[in-house]
Amino acid sequence: MKIFLLRYLSLLILLLPAGVLAQNSSKISLPGADTSKTESKTVRHSLYSGAGYGSNMIYLGSTISQNQPYGYGNITYGFRNQLYASVSAVHLSGTDPFLAFYIGALNYSHVINSWLDISAGIYRYQVPRSLTDTLFSNFTYGDLTMGFDWKLLYSKLSVGGLFSEENQAYFQFRNSRYFQTPEFFKGKANISFDPYANLLFGKLIEVETTAETSVFASTPGRKWRQNDTSNGTSTITPTSERFGIMEVDFGLPVAFNTDFMTIEAEVNYVLPLYNDPVYRSPKGFIFMLSGFFRIF
């Protein structure tokens, strides 16, 4: 009953801008213009290097770092502040080989007018063969996003598709409110804040085991299980599938910005709304720290 009320209370809060009118899909931070705020000038070519740390990597409703801290290095090429191509290498604590998996990303964004923008992205997660049983199988994710600037809030509606051993669709709705301090250091730096709330929708599978009835979520890069690997004995029988709310999360990114670098810290609170005992994303706080430096 508590989960039921929480789901619809969260939905009401997140849909508030729609009521007033009737204020991303890689977990690796990437440089690039948030289309809710305008770049001061257009640069034809740009190149960035970056690195970051996180206490846990949650992606599409589940932990793909197996609840381990992670670190990463990244290089990103940008064209006209609209098209970005990046490659990231991720290290997980206590995992061999040292680089546990790689992420390739291609993103495009375009501002249509003062209140509407569109973007598209495709992401490839590649893991060494020796870790496919431990972590996940290789998969590709693509999404299309529309952004709406309501002045008080900035809203994103995203539709995405996962291509792996089991293809599936996702829907995300995110509200954020970007603001920044006056510039300092002779107009060369500022501190920005971008608090947000996000709803993730995806395929939920209700199953029966010998012990109980549970709701599982399809997880990226992991084929749906007929046997529960948590104890090795219970047989899982799927009874129904539905498209519903998988997760609610809230975050507060704080960034120090200059002309040539951005250093960002983020605290994120994750609230999963299903009870998969094997691959469930953890409930609670996650911390992330990243830095990007402009080479040219």
Where are these regions (language model features)?
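Transmembrane beta-strand segments of Gram-negative outer membrane beta-barrel proteins
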Residues: 40-55, 81, 195
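Surface-exposed strand-loop-strand hairpins of Gram-negative outer-membrane beta-barrel proteins
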Residues: 56-71, 87-94, 239-241, 277
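Outer-membrane beta-barrel translocator/channel fold
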Residues: 57, 62, 119-174, 178, ...
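Short loop/turn motifs that connect adjacent beta-strands in outer-membrane beta-barrel proteins
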Residues: 36-45, 112-117, 180-193, 257-261, ...
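Outer-membrane beta-barrel pore domains and translocons
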Residues: 52-56, 88-92, 109, 121-127, ...
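Repeated loop/turn-to-beta-strand initiation elements of outer-membrane beta-barrel proteins
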Residues: 81-86, 114-118, 150-157, 182-185, ...
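Cleavable N-terminal export/targeting peptides
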Residues: 1-43, 277-280, 294-296
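Outer-membrane beta-barrel "beta-signal"
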Residues: 175, 281-296
